[in-house]
Amino acid sequence: MVTRYLLAAAFAALSIGTASAAEPPPGKVTVVFDRPIPNIPGKSMKGVVVEYGPGAASPSHTHPKTAFIYATVLEGAFRIKVKGQPEKIYHVGENFVEEPGSVHEVSANASDTEPARLLAVFVLDTGEKTLVTPIKK
């Protein structure tokens, strides 16, 4: 009887570990710059540092429809897929852009053992507060 309970507890622990392993941990986003662009009324530039631990990823998402985004990898490597484009891995010093209205289908650390960090610079409407909107499944 005790053996049956121990086996049940072991299977329960394994299934909990498997369920949590299916969802990668989220990343951390820190705003490092936010300023109106003086010669373009109504537009601002906002810089954010995106940090992913090993194996971390963000769910599919969009950014504000007015946002043009330039990103450069500062550390590690990022696996990126924007709708309509092939998935690609970007390494330190490489960069990419996201056009206004793009759907960011994949944003993940390309490594399961090393952290990754990038700087993303948004040009967007002044006063826009929501930088990321998850896509509902």
Task: Write out the residue ranges for each language-model feature.
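Bacterial N-terminal signal peptides
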Residues: 8-17
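A short glycine-rich, His/Asp/Glu-containing loop-to-beta-strand
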Residues: 25-60, 66
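Histidine-centered metal-chelating micro-motifs
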Residues: 57-59, 79, 94-109
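Glycine- and acidic-residue-biased ligand/ion/polar-headgroup-sensing regions
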Residues: 65-84, 92-95
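Short acidic-glycine-tyrosine-enriched beta hairpin
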Residues: 37-42, 52-54, 84-101
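Ligand-binding loop in jelly-roll beta-barrel domains
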Residues: 86-87, 101-129
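Sec/Tat signal peptide C-region and signal peptidase I cleavage site
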Residues: 17-23
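Bacterial N-terminal signal peptides that target proteins for export
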Residues: 1-7
